[in-house]
Amino acid sequence: MNTAFRVRTSATLFLMKELLLPLVIWLPLFAQSPAPFTLYQTIQIDGANYQAIITKPETSGKHPAVFLIGGLGCYSLDNLKPEDPFFQLLSGLTQRGYVTMRVDKNGEGKSEGPPCDSPQSDLQLAVKRSLAGLNALAASNYVDRDNIFILAHSIGPLEGVLVAQKFPVRGFIAAETIGRSWFEYELENVRRQLFILGHPYDEADRTVRIIERCQHRFFVEKQTPEQILKTSPECKDAVNTFGVSYTYLQEIADLDLAVEWKKVDVPVLVTYGTSDPATWSEENRYLADMINSFHPGRASYLEFPSMGHGLDLVPSKRAWLENIRKHEHGPFDQEFLKQVADWLDKNLAAKH
């Protein structure tokens, strides 16, 4: 296990002194210098400069591309260390012939714009950021603009499905995510993780009832965390925004995912790792089934034994939660890279 691995404390939800984790990405492991064949590009959004980080194959000509949308939180994806799963994923895809791009969030790394945790940093800005990156990627002379894919992780597909409605992607990979509403997911996630950690049913029910009352005010009534906590201090954990703006999470909770996915008619690969405690197989199968109900045959589902939420190998969901507490993670699941790259290659070979 890598003891250098760190987790943002703002990206965890503590209830009953136990760790309850939503769809997040961990704080990445940073290297002192960028990986070979890494390029940087500045893109503009609302007059502010944002940094795009690109990896590119050594060979000349136009290449297919993968645009990464990460999970919940405020962090930079620049200068990832070689042991970071996302470094290995993006490097592996580049070795398979794909250009990759990720754009640092506003206020993170060298990206300008409003602070990542400010009310101005909402879902609409996140969508703008990805669209600006995709348009810059498509304009690059080393990218085949007709073969650009989105790879979105965790909460990323909830942003990505909006992006894919406005940019013609070749396909979409939705990794470790959800298919139902955020509010439903939050309640079920609390219950499920309490069971994973060994809590009794009555305690789980009591906790979920508190969470539901608090989050109804937050997600449905659109009260701010400060307004809620003035009268209900017991809601502190329930309205934790995991370091991002409350406006972003309220807009995420407003999404009707079935309505949004119905608008996207491209091949979709939905993946789930069996050691992931931040979502579950039924949720990801639900997403694949939903997409296929609207666009028959478009969605595929792949399950990865012993893979955790961070695309790392661990023996169980509980072990993954315990590793996070100790600021550790397992090795990257190379099978995930292989299957994703094979799926990309297959869709490249297929006729449009």
What are these regions (language model features)?
Residues 33-61:
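N-terminal cap/lid segment of alpha/beta-hydrolase-fold proteins
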Residues 62-71:
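Short beta-strand element of the alpha/beta-hydrolase
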Residues 136-196:
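Primarily recognizes the serine-hydrolase "nucleophile elbow" in alpha/beta-hydrolase
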Residues 264, 270-272:
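Short beta-strand/loop motif that positions the catalytic acidic residue
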